[in-house]
Design a protein with these regions (language model features):
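Short clusters of small/polar residues that mark proteolytic maturation junctions
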Residues: 7, 83, 129, 199-200
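ATP-binding/phosphotransfer module of carbohydrate and carboxylate kinases, centering on a glycine-rich
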Residues: 1-34, 40-43, 47-83, 89-100, ...
């Protein structure tokens, strides 16, 4: 929040110019008056701040048996949220959800959707679960459906971006691993930038021979007795290919009490200086939402500035 004179000083603009700009923004609803500020002897100046409800962002998470959404304002406060269960996910179900929210919230600026599938530039290329979406360019489809920028990507990429933004902005590189109903997925940030590879296959650990061997060829969760070795071997692979500063393992019941064992196994597979810091995180949902919000907000602001 700031007064007209404070804004003028900060922007280096004349007081009349700032006054006209503020009047226009207040008329549009982007700025709101917050009363008078403190006085140093003269008349108290009116204070203005951004209206958090002027810009809304839709975050969509496509889960194994439901689609969950969270509509957030500029301050990341939840305006509306909910879940839609499904047996077989169809494009029509996603269309109906997005159209409904866009119709009811005309100040929706952008949307981001995460899905547990291999997604490359908006195209669902590999999925064992959402067969009706395979091969579709969801980004192009949704941008024709509603006149707002919308991106669709792999859930682990959004999760990793959120993890980086929330906790580890100073780390040079970061790798995340999450074990869900369809197995283990990974994500990678190098020098502050998400790295997905030439065609989006980076961190698709399910294609690794060690994963298939220790998972007994299953598409679901690995056997409990192989959990520690599987995680340690994955960390070993990342260490010799990327050499990250930090590995973040997201909490799962099968991981409980195994972190020390994973570290011991890593010490037997790698020299000490190659072992990254290994952290267990309980913040899956917070990090996932943070990643979705960060991307959606960035797209919305780019449109406002004429960049998209």
């Amino acid at each position: 929040s700031a007064s007209r004179s404070q804004i003028a000083r900060e922007l280096g603009l004349s007081f009349p110019t700032v006054g006209r700009l503020i009047d226009e923004l207040c008329s549009d609803g982007e700025l709101t008056e917050q009363g008078a500020g403190s006085s140093t002897g003269g008349r108290c100046a009116c204070i203005y701040e951004l209206n958090p409800l002027f810009s809304l962002y839709l975050l969509v998470q496509v889960e194994s048996d439901r689609v969950c959404w969270n509509l957030k304002d500029l301050r990341e406060n939840t305006v509306e949220q909910g879940c839609l269960p499904f047996e077989i996910l169809s494009l029509e179900q996603l269309d109906a959800l997005i159209l409904d929210i866009h119709h009811r919230y005309p100040r929706l600026k952008a949307a981001a959707a995460g899905i547990a599938a291999l997604v490359n530039h908006g195209v669902v290329e590999e999925t064992n679960q959402y067969i009706g979406l395979k091969g579709l360019n969801l980004e192009e489809h949704f941008r024709r459906l509603v006149p707002i920028p919308m991106t669709v990507g792999n859930d682990m990429n959004f999760l990793t971006m959120g993890c980086w933004a929330q906790k580890h902005p100073d780390a040079g590189s970061l790798v995340t691993l999450f074990m869900g109903g369809n197995g283990i997925g990974g994500g990678m940030v190098i020098n502050g930038r998400l790295w997905t590879g030439a065609s989006g296959y980076c961190s698709e650990v399910g294609f690794l021979p060690v994963y298939e061997r220790l998972n007994k060829g299953s598409l679901g969760l690995p056997p409990a007795e192989h959990i520690s070795e599987l995680y340690a071997r994955l960390i070993q692979i990342y260490a010799v290919t990327v050499n990250p500063h930090m590995m973040v393992l997201y909490r799962h019941p099968l991981l409980e009490g195994r972190l020390d064992e994973i570290r011991r196994l890593c010490a037997s597979y790698l020299p000490s200086k190659a072992i990254p810091s290994i952290e267990l995180s309980y913040d899956y949902q917070q990090d996932y939402e943070k990643g979705l919000f960060t991307v959606a907000k960035s797209m919305g602001q780019a449109v406002s500035e004429g960049g998209l």
